[in-house]
Each structure stands twice: as structure tokens, then as C-alpha cells.
């Protein structure tokens, strides 16, 4: 990286979200897909995967009655990372506006973060910026019902 070549500090924070896929309200996911102009046909197809999902719990030999699941993305589904990213995109856009002068400048581009599924890497040139970025990310995520897994934060 350029920062290493010119011997300038670079601060990274690895962020993991707590139970992120499990808490996505499906009604809000459909609204987010509509907000980003995903076609109605695609939204209907995705809704079909989530239509009336239910579970039962077995304890010993006893099986519970079925109960319906109204939130959460499917674990292991190839669509889940993309659906999750779409769900939190508005929060990330608001966060990036607040942190617009921070991050790592490479040529004409500023990189604030890298996101893969529910794992997030924050990038800053100094510790104070990283702290500011982290506080604002926590605030934005909380508005969407998401929490950082503090036990898995790594600087």
C-alpha cells in the first residue's frame, strides 16, 4: 500500500455485526429494495423465498407447534449477503457523508471502508478519525437495529 511505502500511519478497524442476518425485518428489506429501484419481478421472486417461513423446535422427543418467522435472512443463502448490503446501504451512505474527509486517499479516490457480508473494515489515516468514524457507524447502525459485536472488534 502507498501508506506503507511513504511510511505514514494507517489505522484499520475490523468490525463484525452482532446477529446481523437474524434481525433484518423483512418489511424493511422490501422497502429498501424498492428504494433502490429493484424491479418488482425480482422483489416478488425474492419474497417467494421468504413467504410464510416457519420453524418448529424439538426438545427431547417433544416437537413444538409451528411458528412463523417475520425477520431475518437465510443463513447460507447465496442471496443473503446482497440482500443484507441493500438493507444497510442507506445507513452506509449517511455514514459516508459524515466521514467524507476521512479514510485513505489513493489517487482521486477516498476509501473509508470495505464491506463483505456483515463484516466491515474501517480505514483511517489517524486514530482520531478512526474513532470518529466508529462512533458514527455505531449510531447509524443502531438506527437500523444493528449492533457491533464488541468482542470481535480488532484494531
What is each residue range found by the language model?
Residues 1-155:
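Nucleotidyl polymerases of mobile genetic elements and RNA viruses
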Amino acid at each position: 500500500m502507498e501508506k506503507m511505502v511513504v511510511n505514514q500511519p494507517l489505522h484499520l478497524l475490523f468490525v463484525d455485526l452482532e446477529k446481523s442476518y437474524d434481525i433484518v425485518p423483512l418489511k424493511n428489506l422490501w422497502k429498501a429494495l424498492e428504494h433502490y429501484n429493484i424491479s418488482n419481478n425480482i422483489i416478488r421472486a425474492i419474497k417467494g423465498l421468504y413467504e410464510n417461513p416457519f420453524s418448529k423446535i424439538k426438545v427431547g422427543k417433544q416437537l413444538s407447534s409451528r411458528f412463523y418467522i417475520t425477520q431475518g435472512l437465510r443463513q447460507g443463502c447465496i442471496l443473503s449477503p446482497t440482500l443484507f448490503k441493500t438493507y444497510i446501504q442507506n445507513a452506509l451512505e449517511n455514514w459516508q457523508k459524515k466521514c467524507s474527509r476521512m479514510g485513505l486517499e489513493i489517487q482521486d479516490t477516498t476509501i473509508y471502508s470495505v464491506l463483505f457480508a456483515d463484516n466491515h473494515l474501517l480505514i483511517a489515516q489517524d486514530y482520531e478519525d478512526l474513532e470518529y468514524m466508529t462512533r458514527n457507524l455505531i449510531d447509524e447502525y443502531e438506527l437500523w437495529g444493528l449492533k457491533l459485536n464488541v468482542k470481535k472488534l480488532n484494531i
